[in-house]
From Swiss-Prot:
Pfam families reported in the protein's UniProt record: GIY-YIG (PF01541), HHH_5 (PF14520), UVR (PF02151), UvrC_RNaseH (PF22920), UvrC_RNaseH_dom (PF08459)
Domain UVR per the UniProt entry, residue ranges: 204-239
Domain GIY-YIG: 16-94
Gene: uvrC
Compartments (UniProt record): Cytoplasm
Role description: The UvrABC repair system catalyzes the recognition and processing of DNA lesions. UvrC both incises the 5' and 3' sides of the lesion. The N-terminal half is responsible for the 3' incision and the C-terminal half is responsible for the 5' incision.
GO cellular component, one term: cytoplasm
Oligomer status and interactors: Interacts with UvrB in an incision complex.
Protein name (record): UvrABC system protein C
Annotated organism of origin: Vibrio cholerae serotype O1 (strain ATCC 39315 / El Tor Inaba N16961)
GO molecular function: DNA binding; excinuclease ABC activity
Keyword line: Cytoplasm, DNA damage, DNA excision, DNA repair, Excision nuclease, SOS response
């Protein structure tokens, strides 16, 4: 029993109603959030003399305070619990690591509908198809669809300001509804109709229509139209050959496979829509030690379906790996309320659904094996680096790089690794300003000062700081970092990574602050770890630099024009569909932009022609 928390007087004040409780430690941090159908009964169970779970014993020993929120129903308690877990990320709760929403394919409600990818709340008018497991799957599908159904994918602002067809029309990837005479409204709507059926999984219906269309065109000697229909038919059949389709009805399912080994849990979700497997994703929730499989699975289930509920497409049936409990039955009610229709959990499925669940379970186990092998590789590399540098332990490393184009749009990056590999949620980019363009020393000094001059939690202090550069960069970095570490409990090792004359991987020179240089064999695991963190930092910096450079170049031409501030620049680019279209626009077209007078349009036109 906890010596910090006197449970007896507290439990006398607790009601038997449903609700949520928050447990705090001595530092006033929320360490656990739970819900209960009967608060008094649940909270009393924590303070029994014989607790059978080591996790519960550890939790109770750290309790200094408990707050209780009473709710009207168990469903309300479930939703409130989810919100609190998301807000506080308590130490003793199972936490969903990947809380991002899934992407969809979006068909707009425009007169000439646009096809695009979408992530987030479904606020725009139109139709949503999905979800897809990741943005790569959406891009691949959009690329495929363009070849079969040439529906436009350009922004509405670009579409409304075109006077001649773009490259997509020239290569047969768009029907060109933006220019009169290229395709009739009826012809475009026909393509959109086929596309809609295809995305709804009604491939055979599309094929029947296209076969009939091809035969009719042949009878009427319209051989070019017949050839187009034939090509579409062949493309759809190739897609069907590659896609596994259920022999059941065209149903929507989520199938949740589960596996847990060596302290790692994986829930693998197969997303099936209209009888087709759209894709899958493995989730690895963060679990406290000694957490039961039932708690892991139910906690994940709750967080997964209650997160982004406004954006997530919840199917009518969810196939589960485990049997139903009181908790899952309450969750089923809550999810149904959020979905606005009945959502049913199914266990022990047979037939095709049973095969789906077996596949999901196998994938979950395979994902754990892959993750364990990856962790083992990373762990071996950390140990090898530790031995090479003569360090007792390495738990955290950071690496910095600078990217610019001839001094333009300088961007610095910081990436973080721990013993499990890249900590991508802690990656950071820094816009570098107020320096002479191309001065990498000044850029490095600025990013290090911004990174380390503020108060750091002891767990965030790295054991090694890598600088992508030679002796000059390293010495400048040391000056800045050493001026910041007076209050740190440990001093990190600072190492420069010089690429050498040939800049070939495996020939890197490593430099210490003492000026010592050394090389590692090209097949050394320690070198592979250094290359990994260096490449991550380099790629992170380049991606940020290119985005910033593109943004700067889009607006820099307009910045020198009197009367054109940030809002008008944005309006011009948005309304006319980009810088290239703006440069082609006439004075009259520019003057149509909201907030742009005819006189200002004349000035803009003349400035862009210089």
């Amino acid at each position: 029993m906890s010596t910090q928390f006197d449970s007896a007087p507290f439990l006398k004040t607790v009601t038997n109603q449903p609700g949520v409780y928050r447990m705090y430690n001595a530092e006033a941090e929320v360490i656990y959030v739970g819900k209960a159908k009967d608060l008094k009964k649940r909270l009393t169970s924590y303070f029994r003399k014989n607790l059978d779970s080591e996790k519960t014993k550890a939790l109770v020993s750290n309790i200094a305070k408990i707050d209780v929120t009473v709710t009207h129903t168990e469903t309300e308690a479930l939703i409130l619990e989810h919100n609190y877990i998301k807000q506080y990320l308590p130490k003793y709760n199972v936490l969903l690591r990947d809380d991002k929403s899934y992407p969809y394919i979006f068909l707009s409600a425009h007169k000439h509908p646009r096809l695009s990818s979408h992530r987030g709340a479904k606020k725009r008018r139109g139709e949503y198809f999905g979800p897809y497991p990741d943005s790569g799957a959406v891009r691949e599908t959009l690329h495929l669809i363009q070849k079969i159904f040439p529906v436009r994918q350009c922004e509405d602002t670009v579409y409304s300001n075109r006077t001649r067809p773009c490259l997509m029309y020239q290569i047969g990837r768009c029907a060109g509804p933006c220019v009169k005479g290229l395709i009739s409204d009826q012809g475009y709507q026909e393509i959109v109709h086929y596309l809609r059926l295809f995305l709804q999984g009604k491939d055979n219906q599309v094929l029947s229509i296209l076969v009939e269309k091809m035969e009719q065109a042949s009878r009427e000697l319209r051989f070019e139209d017949a050839a187009k229909a034939r090509d579409q038919i062949q493309a759809i059949r190739r897609v069907q050959e590659q896609q596994f389709v259920s022999d059941d009805s065209l149903e929507d399912l989520d199938v949740l496979g589960f596996a847990q080994e060596n302290g790692i849990a994986c829930i693998h979700i197969l997303m099936i829509r209209q009888g087709k497997v759209l894709g899958s994703r493995s989730h690895f929730p963060k679990i406290p030690s000694d957490t039961s499989q039932v708690e892991v699975f139910e906690s994940f289930l709750s967080q997964y379906y209650l997160s982004h509920s406004e954006a997530r497409s919840i199917p009518a049936r969810i196939i589960l790996n485990r049997g139903l409990t009181e908790e899952t039955e309450a969750l089923q009610i809550a999810i149904s309320e959020l979905a606005g229709r009945k959502v049913t959990f199914h266990v022990n499925p047979t037939g095709t659904r049973g095969r789906y669940l077996k596949l999901a379970n196998t994938n979950a186990l395979t994902a754990i094996t892959t993750k364990m092998n990856h962790k083992m590789t990373i762990s071996q590399r950390f140990k090898a680096l530790q031995e090479e540098l003569g360090m007792d332990a390495i738990t955290r490393m950071e690496c910095f790089d600078i990217s610019h184009t001839m001094g333009e749009s300088t961007m610095a990056s910081c990436v973080v690794f721990n013993q499990e590999g890249p900590l991508k949620q802690e990656y950071r980019r820094y816009n570098i300003t107020g320096i002479t363009g191309g001065d990498d020393y000044a850029a490095m000094a600025q990013v290090l000062e911004r990174r380390y001059s503020k108060q750091l939690d002891s767990s965030k202090i790295p054991d090694i700081i890598f600088i992508d550069g030679g002796k000059g960069q390293l010495n400048r970095a040391y000056e800045i970092i050493s001026s910041c570490w007076q209050d740190w409990p440990k001093y990190p090792k600072i190492i420069g990574i010089a690429k050498g004359v040939t800049r070939k991987p495996g020939l890197e020179t490593l430099i210490t602050i003492d000026g010592d240089e050394f090389h590692l064999p090209s097949d050394a695991p320690a070198l592979h770890l250094i290359q990994h963190i260096r490449d991550e930092s380099h790629n992170h910096a380049i991606a940020g630099h290119r985005a910033q450079r593109g943004k700067t170049r889009r607006t820099s031409t307009l910045e020198g024009i009197e009367g054109v501030g940030p809002k008008r620049r944005q309006a011009l680019l948005k309304y006319l569909g980009g810088m290239q279209e703006l440069k082609r626009a006439s004075v009259e077209e520019i003057a149509k932009v909201p907030g742009i007078s005819h006189a200002l349009a004349e000035n803009i036109y003349q400035a862009l022609k210089q």
